[in-house]
């Protein structure tokens, strides 16, 4: 198994040997660096903390800067932690993780933050059918309807679907195939769509 951090570049199409168009997502994957090695003795579990997308020192908070300097790596915008068993090889602080750890045909799961849609009603957010257009209704077309009876249950249940902020959720899509690996450009081409807008950060992990 393998894992890496990346940034979504955008979508494109590739053609297979049967001249069929395959929708693909291009991801800038790595290079990442190990910023911390967590051990069972010290932290209670074994994991690697890796970082991606370098940033200037004057843009980095002092505590974070000290954390990066301790590992001998440059400050980065994105940090994530992965369990040690995900990686096939033993890693040390400062080691580089490249996109070449993947190969064509690998099955991966991609995690990211979905696009934010802002405040949305129940029709857009949860695909409610809305109220009747006839029988005297005037302003109930996109209304949620009843959210709890008066005599029973005399309350609104927790988790009731209502209007609110849509999107900006942590999303993982599993079962995606690696179509192409371009180590010289640090690019990973994956079949299908992945969460989030362009230039958003992603976690790519090979499936078992």
Curated annotation (Swiss-Prot):
Pfam families, A to Z: Ribosomal_L3
Protein name (database record): Large ribosomal subunit protein uL3
Known function: One of the primary rRNA binding proteins, it binds directly near the 3'-end of the 23S rRNA, where it nucleates assembly of the 50S subunit.
Organism, as annotated: Chloroherpeton thalassium (strain ATCC 35110 / GB-78)
Subunit-structure text: Part of the 50S ribosomal subunit. Forms a cluster with proteins L14 and L19.
Gene field: rplC
Coiled coil: none
GO biological process, one term: translation
One function term, GO molecular function aspect: rRNA binding
InterPro entries: Ribosomal_uL3, Ribosomal_uL3_bac/org-type, Transl_B-barrel_sf
């Amino acid at each position: 198994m393998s894992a890496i951090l990346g940034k979504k570049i955008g979508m494109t199409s590739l053609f297979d040997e049967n001249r069929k168009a395959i929708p693909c997502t291009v991801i800038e994957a790595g290079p990442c660096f190990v910023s911390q090695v967590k051990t069972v003795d010290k932290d209670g579990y074994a994991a690697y903390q890796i970082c991606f997308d370098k940033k200037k020192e004057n843009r980095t908070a002092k505590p974070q800067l000290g954390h990066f300097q301790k590992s001998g790596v440059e400050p980065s915008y994105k940090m994530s932690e992965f369990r040690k068993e995900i990686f096939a090889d033993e890693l040390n602080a400062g080691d580089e993780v490249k996109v070449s750890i993947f190969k064509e045909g690998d099955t991966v799961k991609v995690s990211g933050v979905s696009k934010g849609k802002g405040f949305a009603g129940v029709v857009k957010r949860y695909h409610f059918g809305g109220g009747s257009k006839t029988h005297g209704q005037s302003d109930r077309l996109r209304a949620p309807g009843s959210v709890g009876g008066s005599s029973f249950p005399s309350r609104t249940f927790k988790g009731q679907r209502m209007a609110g902020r849509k999107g900006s959720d942590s999303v993982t899509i599993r079962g995606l195939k690696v179509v192409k690996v371009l180590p010289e450009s640090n690019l990973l081409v994956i079949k299908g769509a992945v969460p989030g807008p362009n230039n958003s950060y992603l976690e790519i992990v090979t499936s078992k």
